[in-house]
């Protein structure tokens, strides 16, 4: 079985992280976002993953080729010369996707969840039509485009953009199974599958919705990245608690790479991910943060709701909070306060940032 993952975007919402590497390779809970998806696909029996690439495609190709042998699957690149939206890439990869008559997966690369791929295959085969969409329930449907479908069968009737009166609380979760017949509906041009292809399929009775059980998050921007981390760590607590850290100073759900080092009298957690080579010195407090490879947090600093990127250096007695994001190789000098700062890569911060803003 095949899968196509849409990884061609610039990742602008997740800057400054994506100024250094493409978004699919950003570590989420100590593993590239894309690898969470590819490993789940391989476990579900997918043997050929096609990546619809454009931005920093060489870096993506190098990393994924290294994973091919480990996972025992084929990984191909489909290169976009111009942005093709969310449907155009399917037309571009038509020859690969139609090598067999089997249905195939299509995934947005921003999504993290429990990935119920085997259940999706069974659901798609059961209804026997052209397309299946994974949907998830949300608390405030007026913020989203919602999916209106039959409760018992899942057949989709229509899509409603940001409804002001309640019609549904189910939204598109960004994962689909499509039969090869869908490829005949798509031209090789910039096209939205959500706005141009799916509504037509729904009118013809060819589109069904399967409801996702468990957590789901679009982690395409920093605040949602951190929320997604919290949900993922809670899922680990329930399913693979042995992967989480425990011991003195560890509070709640904390994921620590074996090569990371934590000093004395620290308070780490809840909801913290520390990557490879990270050093946390004595007396540091970290809550609801992700700290990426080879970063160093010096003694007695306090971090809450932050993303600290590769090789950053945070000084002593620093306080950072409110979705502060440090790009790659940023230095924060001692005794500073950063409130909601977004700092571009390779900067040295010498004064406090009391109000949220971008530090160029």
Curated annotation (Swiss-Prot):
Pfam families: GMPPB_C (PF25087), NTP_transferase (PF00483). Mg(2+) binds at residues 110, 218. The keyword Nucleotidyltransferase applies. One of its GO terms (molecular function) is mannose-1-phosphate guanylyltransferase (GTP) activity. One of its GO terms (cellular component) is GDP-mannose pyrophosphorylase complex. Its cofactor is Mg(2+). It is found in: Cytoplasm. Residues 2-222 are annotated as: Substrate-binding domain. Enzyme activity is reduced by incorporation into the GMPPA-GMPPB mannose-1-phosphate guanylyltransferase complex. Allosterically inhibited, when part of the GMPPA-GMPPB complex, by GDP-alpha-D-mannose binding to GMPPA. GO terms for biological process: GDP-mannose biosynthetic process; protein glycosylation. The active site is at residue 162. Residues 245-360 are annotated as: Hexapeptide repeat domain. It is an enzyme of class 2 (transferase). Catalytic subunit of the GMPPA-GMPPB mannose-1-phosphate guanylyltransferase complex. Catalyzes the formation of GDP-mannose, an essential precursor of glycan moieties of glycoproteins and glycolipids. Can catalyze the reverse reaction in vitro. Together with GMPPA regulates GDP-alpha-D-mannose levels. Component of the GMPPA-GMPPB mannose-1-phosphate guanylyltransferase complex composed of 4 GMPPA subunits and 8 GMPPB subunits; the complex is organized into three layers, a central layer made up of 2 GMPPA dimers sandwiched between two layers each made up of 2 GMPPB dimers. GMPPB catalytic activity is reduced when part of the complex and binding of GDP-alpha-D-Mannose by GMPPA induces allosteric feedback inhibition of GMPPB. This is Mannose-1-phosphate guanylyltransferase catalytic subunit beta. The gene is GMPPB.
């Amino acid at each position: 079985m095949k899968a196509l993952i849409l990884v061609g975007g610039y990742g602008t919402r997740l800057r400054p992280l994506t100024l250094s590497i493409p978004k699919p390779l950003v570590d989420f809970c100590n593993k590239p976002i894309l690898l969470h998806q590819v490993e789940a696909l391989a476990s579900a029996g997918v043997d050929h993953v096609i990546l619809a690439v454009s931005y920093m495609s060489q870096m993506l190709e190098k990393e994924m080729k290294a994973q091919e042998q480990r996972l025992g699957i084929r990984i191909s690149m489909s290169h976009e010369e111009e942005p093709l939206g969310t449907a155009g890439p399917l037309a571009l990869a038509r020859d690969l996707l139609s090598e067999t008559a089997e249905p195939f997966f299509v995934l947005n690369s921003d999504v993290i969840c429990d990935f119920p791929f085997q259940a999706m295959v069974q659901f798609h085969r059961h209804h026997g039509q052209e397309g299946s969409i994974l949907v998830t329930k949300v608390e405030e449907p007026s913020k989203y485009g919602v999916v209106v479908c039959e409760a018992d069968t899942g057949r989709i009737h229509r899509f409603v953009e940001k409804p002001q009166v309640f019609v549904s609380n189910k939204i598109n979760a960004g994962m689909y199974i499509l039969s090869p017949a869908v490829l005949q509906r798509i031209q090789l041009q910039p096209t939205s599958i959500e706005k141009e292809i799916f509504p037509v399929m729904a009118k013809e009775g060819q589109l069904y919705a399967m409801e996702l059980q468990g957590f789901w998050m679009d982690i395409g921007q920093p605040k949602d990245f951190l929320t997604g981390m919290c949900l993922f760590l809670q899922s680990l607590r329930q399913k693979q608690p042995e992967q989480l850290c425990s011991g003195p100073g560890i509070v709640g759900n904390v994921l620590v790479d074996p090569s990371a080092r934590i000093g004395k009298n620290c308070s780490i957690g809840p909801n913290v991910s520390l990557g490879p080579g990270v050093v946390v010195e004595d007396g540091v407090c970290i809550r609801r943060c992700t700290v990426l490879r080879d970063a160093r947090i010096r003694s007695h600093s306090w971090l809450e709701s932050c993303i600290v990127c590769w090789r950053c250096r945070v000084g002593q007695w620093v306080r950072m909070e409110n979705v502060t994001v440090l790009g790659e190789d940023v230095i924060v000098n001692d005794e500073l306060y950063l409130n909601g700062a977004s700092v571009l890569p390779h900067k040295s911060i010498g004064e406090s940032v009391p109000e949220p803003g971008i530090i160029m």
